[in-house]
């Protein structure tokens, strides 16, 4: 088993596969994304969540993207409703079924303010939100929506997206941005910085506010889609955390453990795929390595 600093803690909330489980108990994930121009991003996020071990993944996309995403995989539940007239009502009916929601992959510039809907919906639900890619544009223009959201919010900016987001604040350090937005923030890079706003010198699992780093080495190949894979993996780990939390009293930090696990899996996928494909490695090659990556870090 590969060296993963927090493997023991992560394994505590990975659901064990038993004969008594029924479909949905290992996670129901939603992906908000997919437009006429971008169909790959929501697929990569969705299939990653599924391959990591979520039971059901729903993709809420625009009408033009629906048939394309469906053709990629028959295992995804694709709902092309984002550009329908009553999109808010239609999506709201699904929210209570989900354990985590990814907003942004391939969403494009279409002004679908799902975050506002989730904010209103939070009176009945504190659905965890993972916001990436085009979803971060919504955050930049609606910071108060994130600050006021009752449930967990995880932001996953790359270098350019982080500069754009942090420019809204006088202190541009990741820890301050996360604290100001009342969110978990993963500043992606060769070393991923994971913080929800308070820094401790040593990691302590009795605290829910920590800054840690994932130094797992991936590869030097920067193919498109890696961020989408990470978002999907985060969603599954967060869903497992929510399910674990609802059935157990042991408290572990969401920002540290679930996000760290997703970062480690994604980077290990990159490493394994690059070893096999080298410069020709693509995100699809990484998808094929999710199982091996997971088992090398956490066992079966």
UniProtKB/Swiss-Prot annotation:
Q: Name the UniProt key words of this record, in alphabetical order.
A: ATP-binding, Lyase, NAD, NADP, Nucleotide-binding, Phosphoprotein
Binding residues for (6S)-NADPHX, per the UniProt record?
106, 158-164, 228
Q: What is its EC number?
A: 4.2.1.93
* GO BP annotations, alphabetical order: metabolite repair; nicotinamide nucleotide metabolic process
Q: Which PROSITE patterns match?
A: YJEF_C_3
User: What is one Pfam family matched by this protein?
Assistant: Carb_kinase
- Which InterPro entries does the entry link to? CARKD, Ribokinase-like
Which reaction is the catalytic activity of this chain? (6S)-NADHX + ATP = ADP + phosphate + NADH + H(+); (6S)-NADPHX + ATP = ADP + phosphate + NADPH + H(+)
Looking at the record, the residues that make up the YjeF C-terminal domain are 6-297
Which sites bind ATP? 188-192, 218-227
What is the superkingdom listed in this entry's lineage? Eukaryota
What are its cofactors? Answer: Mg(2+)
Q: Which Gene Ontology MF annotations are present?
A: ATP binding; ATP-dependent NAD(P)H-hydrate dehydratase activity
Family to which the UniProt record says this protein belongs: Belongs to the NnrD/CARKD family.
Q: What does this protein do?
A: Catalyzes the dehydration of the S-form of NAD(P)HX at the expense of ATP, which is converted to ADP. Together with NAD(P)HX epimerase, which catalyzes the epimerization of the S- and R-forms, the enzyme allows the repair of both epimers of NAD(P)HX, a damaged form of NAD(P)H that is a result of enzymatic or heat-dependent hydration.
Instruction: Please identify the protein, giving its name as recorded.
Output: ATP-dependent (S)-NAD(P)H-hydrate dehydratase
Biological source species: Pediculus humanus subsp. corporis (Body louse)
Top-down, what is the taxonomic lineage of the species of origin? Answer: Eukaryota, Metazoa, Ecdysozoa, Arthropoda, Hexapoda
